Amino acid sequence: EPYVTYPVKSATVYDLDQVRTMESGPVWYETESLGVGSLQISNGCPCFCSFCAESWERKPYRERSLSMLAKGLRSAKAQQGLDTVSLFSFNFNTHTDLYPMILSFYREIANVSLKSQRFDLLSTDRFLVEVQQVIGKTTVSCGMEGISERLRRSLHKNLNEEQIYKACEFLFERGIRELKIFLICTGLEQSEDFGEFGNFVKRLGDLKCMADSNVRIIFSLTPLYYPPHTPLQFHECLTALEDKKKIGREVERICKFHDMEFRESASYEEIWLTQLLAMGDRRLTPALIRSSLTDGFVYYNTVPKQILRNWRTYFMELGLSEGNYLRAKGKDDIFPWDDIDLGISKKFLWEEYGRSIHFTEREYCLGR
């Protein structure tokens, strides 16, 4: 529109204490969610993981103060009848007031639910595991992402094997019941990466035995997604261009050989359609309308293989090439989302992309 100034700048609330958290709302009569609510403790992430949209789209990292969180919890408990509160955060263990927050909440409400956390922060703080044990948390989820240190550098994970082992040592000592480790299939895996992963899983099993732990260890593998507004927007979308099932089978073989559980969380068809819609522009609108309205496709858990075949037919009829959307891009390429300014320059994203493809990384900062 002529009256809109481009690029459109994102509306960022820099002080979370100035906005109300989710204290009230409909109380749905659903057995699983009854009495459960979320409390946002922070927004964004201080890290630079190249694959993570939240890490880039929601910068700068901001925290809600402990006093406002306590006030919000009491209000939410009264208005929604909560007995369980989930700490809503991309990585809850980055919060400055983590310990006083958890312990004060535990005195206010029956259950405090904590989601995924970072291995590196866990590895430097044995007390964090003890606090989680006090509040009854026996299931822990952490992102390892790349199966080797080389691939984790590409993903800018800032995580080495010794940190993972140390974190797992703390967890096993405290008798956790389940550990879920998230992995990412990058499409860049080579024989040395599989070898390193095999050694890691064996050593993890040995650590479990030495700790006399009965922990259930689950590895969950997801194909890499290349989000807009991140360094990976320039990368060739390898996991969408070709089904990397051989990589998944090898990771599964290694896990099961060492008596670990393995899961895959997304199919090739899902990542293909997700990536195409993310990289797409308005020329895909007729295909989207046809798929949804004419062919009646509604996503529910899976994307059938026939949907992928349908979309390739749409592309052919529209004179479009899926390869053009999924190819590697240069620093001067124009993206459909370039008219949206999220506060991170395209130049900086390009520089970080250069680090990623050369398997190097910079440190992140918590600003403390």
Where are the language model's segments positioned?
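Acidic, low-complexity intrinsically disordered segments
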Residues: 1-67, 290, 299-305, 310-339, ...
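Terminal amphipathic helices with adjacent charged low-complexity linkers/tails
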Residues: 3-11, 61-65, 100-103, 109, ...
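Glycine- and acidic
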Residues: 34-36, 50-59, 82-88, 147-154, ...
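Flexible glycine/acidic-rich beta-alpha junction loops that bind and position SAM and/or redox cofactors
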Residues: 47, 96, 149-155, 184-192, ...
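Alpha-helix N-cap and loop-to-helix initiation/capping positions
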Residues: 61-68, 155-163, 192-196, 236-243
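Conserved SAM/AdoMet-binding glycine-rich loop
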Residues: 73-218, 222-226
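Long, polar/charge-rich, low-hydrophobicity segments
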Residues: 198, 202, 206-210, 233-245, ...
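C-terminal low-complexity, glycine/proline- and small-hydrophobic-enriched intrinsically disordered tails
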Residues: 208, 242-356, 363-367
